[in-house]
């Protein structure tokens, strides 16, 4: 007998991909067996789907990279939708405002309706992950009270307190 050829070995690995790469269809670099490979991320690829790299596995087998989304400092993912929590000042919520909101495709202007409350969700159509249909970005308003840094700001809060009184919670 002589030496038997070793069987081809397909290799499987997980690949955490930045949301921006999934949104735009960017390339990412990975290290495989001491080499650096540049991989094109298909636009809108879903977690659990795989990218096959022919001949990059063990013994000339294929390498299958199972996609997962890397954690993002600002966004969460729900299916194809992107979730974002937007800090809003009390006067923006009460009076309405137009504010800049980050999305995976860059900042956009969002109109906050008057009399908005914390937890209200606003939809930016088509600003989620690509696909058929594309996802949306869901912006949840989080009303926060700014800290007081000087006498003018303290006086503004005191005027609000005097104007609203103690029974504003029941309104």
Task: Identify the function of each model-found stretch.
Residues 1-29, 58-59, 64, 164-171:
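Post-J-domain flank of DnaJ/Hsp40 co-chaperones
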Residues 10, 18-25, 31-50:
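Glycine/acidic-rich beta-strand-loop module
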Residues 35-36, 40-171:
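Intrinsically disordered, low-complexity linker/assembly segments
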């Amino acid at each position: 007998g002589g030496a038997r050829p070793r069987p081809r070995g397909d290799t499987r690995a997980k690949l955490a991909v930045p949301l921006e790469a999934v949104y735009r269809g960017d390339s990412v670099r990975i290290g495989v067996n001491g080499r650096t490979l540049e991989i094109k991320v298909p636009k809108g690829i879903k977690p659990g789907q795989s990218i096959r790299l022919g001949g990059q596995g063990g013994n000339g087998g294929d390498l299958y990279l199972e996609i997962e989304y890397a954690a993002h400092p600002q966004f969460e993912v729900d299916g194809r939708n992107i979730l974002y929590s937007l800090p809003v000042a009390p006067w923006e919520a009460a009076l309405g405002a137009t504010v800049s909101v980050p999305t995976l495709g860059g900042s956009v202007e969002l109109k906050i309706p008057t009399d908005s409350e914390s937890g209200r969700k606003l939809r930016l159509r088509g600003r989620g992950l690509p696909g058929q249909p594309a996802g949306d970005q869901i912006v949840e308003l989080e009303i926060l009270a700014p800290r007081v840094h000087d006498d003018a700001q303290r006086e503004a809060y005191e005027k609000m307190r005097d104007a609203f009184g103690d029974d504003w919670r029941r309104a």
